[in-house]
C-alpha cells in the first residue's frame, strides 16, 4: 500500500504541476500525440511516460520518479523509480520506454545493481556507434546524421576482405593452401574491386597485405579449434556473472563450431541492432567442469589494443544475442593481425553504462528539433558538447561537420557554448564560408530534419515488431505467413535466390512488386530483419526474392514475413550533399557561387570554338529533326560554361530533346552524366538512346532497371565479361562516355575518379535541392530539364514546406534568364485542350507542332452505333448533354454535379465521392463500347480513397484502364482523360491538394484528344486555381450542369447496355 500511496502523491505533484495542465487534458494530449503507439507489458514491455518528477528520498539521495502506463486508455498506472546514475537519463512525459528488471506492487526500481531503462526502444542504434560515443558523443551523433561523410579508407577495405576470408575459412578450412585460395577469390569479387578503384589502390598490393595476415589465421585455428584434449587450448582468465565467486577464473576456451556468419539482429528490447561477425559454439573448460555457450566473436584487423571501444562492442553483442538465445554472459575479441583472442565478460556494470550511453545518443537523435526559448520558433537543437581534445579532433572524420554545425547552427543560439580551446579549429575549418553559405546549410538541415520526422515519412521498421503481418497486409506493404520452398540458389557470393509461398492459399493482394526493397523477418518473436533484398518476381502463388543472406540455415517450418522497405525518408544522401557543398574545394566553391550567391552563368561567344571540326556534319544532321526551340536549347547548352535550364512544357518532347542533346554531345566527344530522381525517367531516355546504337553504362541495382536496358548495366557487363581484375574494371569505366544513374546513385566508386563534361538532370523541377546537388559535383557544366509550373518536389511536412523546401534547384536558378530556354512547341494536345493550360499557366506560349496535332480528335470506331443505342435507351430531350460529351469534335467539357447532387464522404481512409465515381465509370464504359481501347483511357483523382472506389467499380466490368493520382501521371499522356475532383460540400471545407495550381496544370495537360472534368462548381470555386479555370470554361460555354439524380438514370442505361 505504501508504494501505491507514493504513486498517488507523485501524481498530485508532477502529473499536474509538471504538465501545467489538468490531468485529464494532459492525458488526452498525450493520447492524441501517440494515437498508434503500441503499449504492452511482459518481457517486451513498452510503457508511455505520463509524468516525471525528481525528488530526494529518505536517505537524502536524488531519485527520478516516473508515472508510466502500458494501457492505451491510460487507466492502469505504474511507478518507475530511477536511482543512482540512472537519474541522469533524459526521460520526458510522452516518451516511450522499455524496462528490464522486476516489478513489485506496480513499482519498478532501476538502480546501479539491478535493472535497465531503454529510452525510445524503437530507435535501433548499432553497437559500433555506441562504442564510438565513449570518447566523443558528438562524433557518434554526427556520424549517424552525416553518414556519407565518413570516407572509405585502405584500412577499411583490408578489414572487409580479411573478415570475409576468415568467415569463409571457419566454415571450410584454415589450411594454408585453402586460405590462399579463399583470399585470391575474395579479392577478385566485384564489390572489392570497386573499392580498390575508388581508393586508387593496386590489386597486387592488397593481395600481398591480405596474405600477410593468413599465418595468424592458421595460428588462431591451431590454438582454439580441433584439439585432442581440453588442456591443449590456451589458458585464459574469464569469470562469468553466473559463476560461483569462489571459482577459479582460469579456463581453457575451445571454439567448437561456427553457428552463423554476419548474423543480423535487431533488438527493440534493448534499442540495439548489429551484425555479429561470427557466432560460435564455445566450450569453457575449467578443471573437470565444462560449460557450453553460444557467443559472439568480434574480429578486428587493426592494432591489438584490447581497447574499451572494442570490448564495449563485444558486450553490446552479448545483449543482441539474448534476442535469439540464452545470455552468453561473455563474448570473444579476436585480433586477426596476431591471432590473439581475448574473452570479454559482460557484467551488469558494463551493460548498464553502455545502455546509458545508448540512451544519451538516442535522446540527441530523437530531439534534433527544438523551440527557441525567446521566439518559440522551430530550430535545430544543439548536439552533444564539443570535447576539449585537440589531438583527438585532429584525426576525426567528422571534424568538418562538427565545426560547420557549431558555427552555422549552435553559435547562432542564445545559449551557445563552445570550449575556447576549440574556437581556432572551428574557425580554421569554416573560414572559407560566407554568412549566406552558413544560413543555407542551417536552413536545409532544418527542413530535411523536419521532413524526416514527418509522421507520414518515418521509416516503418518498427511495424515489423509492433504490428502483426495480418494487420500490415491490409496496407499492402507486407506479406506474412510465408514458407520457404525449394532449395536456395546462390546467384553469387552475398546474393541468394529464395522462393516463398503462403502456407495457406494464394498470395494476398499487395502493393509489393518486382524491384521493391524488402526486409525478411520470421513471424516468430526475435527473428526480426533476418535478411534484406529485392523482390525479383511476384505472382498469385509465389514471391521470389534476391536476399543478402541464405535463410536455408533456419528450420523448414519457419514462417516468414516480407515488409516493404521504404526509402523516401532517407536523408543520408541529401545531408551528405549539403555537407559536401560546404567543403573547401574548387568544385564546392563554384557550386556555392552559382547556387547560393546567384553568380551569373557564363557562356562562350562562338559555337565554332566548341564544335570539333569532324563532328559538324553529324551535329547538323541531328539538328535537322528538331524544331526551333529545341535547336536553341542545343546551342545554349553547347555554349554554356556553367549551366543551362531547359523548360519542358507539357507535350514538348522533353525526353526526345534530352536524347538528342546526348547524341550531339557524344558526337562532339564530350562525356555525359545522365541522371534523374527516378529509375523510370533515366531508362525512358536510355530506351530512345539505345535505338541510335550509342553505348552507355547504366549504374544501379539491376532489379530497378528496365528489362531492355539491363544488358547495359554494370552488373550484367561484369557478369558477361567475367571481370575479375581491377584492370578490366578500369577499362570498363573508362570505355564509356555516357554514364547513367539516379541522383541517389552518386556514391558509386566511378565518381571518385571521373569528372564529366556535362551532367544532365531530368525531372529537375521535381527534385529537392540537396538531392539534385549530388551529381553536379562530378561535372564541369550541368543542364537542368524540367518545368516549375508542373509538380514540385514532394514535401510532406507542412512546416518544411512553409520554410521553402518545395523550391527545386531548377526554380531557384530560373531567375537567371540568360540560362533559360523554353520548349514551347507541343505534340500531345489538340488546340482546344492546349488552350486551357495556355490560359491557366503559360500565358499563350504553348503552340501545336502541326495542324494535324491541333485538329486531332478521338477516333471512336463504333460511335454511330453507340449514339443510336443512347438515343434508344435515353430520352434525348432529357439528356442533351450526353451526346455532347461523347462527340469527338467536343474535346473539352466540365460536368457540374451541383444539382445531382454528388456529396463527398470523409472517412478514416480519406476523402471520396461515390456519385462522381459512378459517373466516371459510366462515361468510361460508354467510351470503351464506342471503340476506345481501355489502355487509351486515363482516370485521375486527387485522393487515394477515390482511386480505390473507382478501381473497385471498374474491376466488375472493365480492365486495363489506368486510375491514378496526378503525381503518377506526370510525364504521361492518354487519348482520353477523365478527372474526378471529389470535393463537394456545403460548409466550405477545403483541402490542400486542390489548392496547388501546378497539380491542376498537370491534370489538364495529360489528354491528347478528349478531356472530361467532373466536379461540383460551387465547392471548387473555393480553390483559386480552379476558380480561374472554371471562369475560363464558363466563358467558353464548356460547363454542363447535370440534372438531378442523373447518376441513377445513367446507371439504368449502363445496365441495359451491359445486358445486351
From Swiss-Prot:
Acetylated by EP300, leading to stimulate the 5'-3' endonuclease, the 5'-3' helicase and DNA-dependent ATPase activities, possibly by increasing DNA substrate affinity. Changing residue 221 to G: In PEOA6; uncertain significance; modestly decreased of both ATP hydrolysis activity and nuclease activity. Binds 1 [4Fe-4S] cluster. Changing residue 654 to E: Abolishes ability to unwind DNA, while it does not affect ability to resect DNA. It holds the Pfam family AAA_12. Changing residue 640 to L: In PEOA6; likely pathogenic; abolished both ATP hydrolysis activity and nuclease activity. Its EC number is 3.1.-.-, 3.6.4.12. Residues 81-519 are annotated as: Nuclease activity. Residues 520-1060 are annotated as: Helicase activity. It comes from the Eukaryota. InterPro entries: Cas4_exonuclease, Dna2/JHS1_DEXXQ-box, DNA2/NAM7-like_C, DNA2/NAM7_AAA_11, DNA2_Rift, DNA_replication_fac_Dna2_N, P-loop_NTPase, PDDEXK-like_dom_sf. [4Fe-4S] cluster binds at residues 136, 393, 396, 402. GO terms for biological process: base-excision repair; DNA double-strand break processing; DNA geometric change; DNA replication; DNA replication checkpoint signaling; DNA replication, Okazaki fragment processing; DNA replication, removal of RNA primer; mitochondrial DNA repair. The keyword DNA-binding applies. GO terms for cellular component: chromosome, telomeric region; cytoplasm; mitochondrial nucleoid; mitochondrion; nucleoplasm; nucleus. Its main location: nucleus. It is an enzyme of class 3 (hydrolase). It is found in: Nucleus; Mitochondrion. Its cofactor is [4Fe-4S] cluster. GO terms for molecular function: 4 iron, 4 sulfur cluster binding; 5'-3' DNA helicase activity; 5'-flap endonuclease activity; ATP binding; ATP hydrolysis activity; DNA binding; DNA helicase activity; helicase activity. Interacts with BLM and WDHD1. Belongs to the DNA2/NAM7 helicase family. Key enzyme involved in DNA replication and DNA repair in nucleus and mitochondrion. Involved in Okazaki fragments processing by cleaving long flaps that escape FEN1: flaps that are longer than 27 nucleotides are coated by replication protein A complex (RPA), leading to recruit DNA2 which cleaves the flap until it is too short to bind RPA and becomes a substrate for FEN1. Also involved in 5'-end resection of DNA during double-strand break (DSB) repair: recruited by BLM and mediates the cleavage of 5'-ssDNA, while the 3'-ssDNA cleavage is prevented by the presence of RPA. It is linked to Progressive external ophthalmoplegia with mitochondrial DNA deletions, autosomal dominant, 6: A disorder characterized by muscle weakness, mainly affecting the lower limbs, external ophthalmoplegia, exercise intolerance, and mitochondrial DNA deletions on muscle biopsy. Symptoms may appear in childhood or adulthood and show slow progression. Seckel syndrome 8: A rare autosomal recessive disorder characterized by proportionate dwarfism of prenatal onset associated with low birth weight, growth retardation, severe microcephaly with a bird-headed like appearance, and intellectual disability. This is DNA replication ATP-dependent helicase/nuclease DNA2. It comes from Homo sapiens (Human). The gene is DNA2.
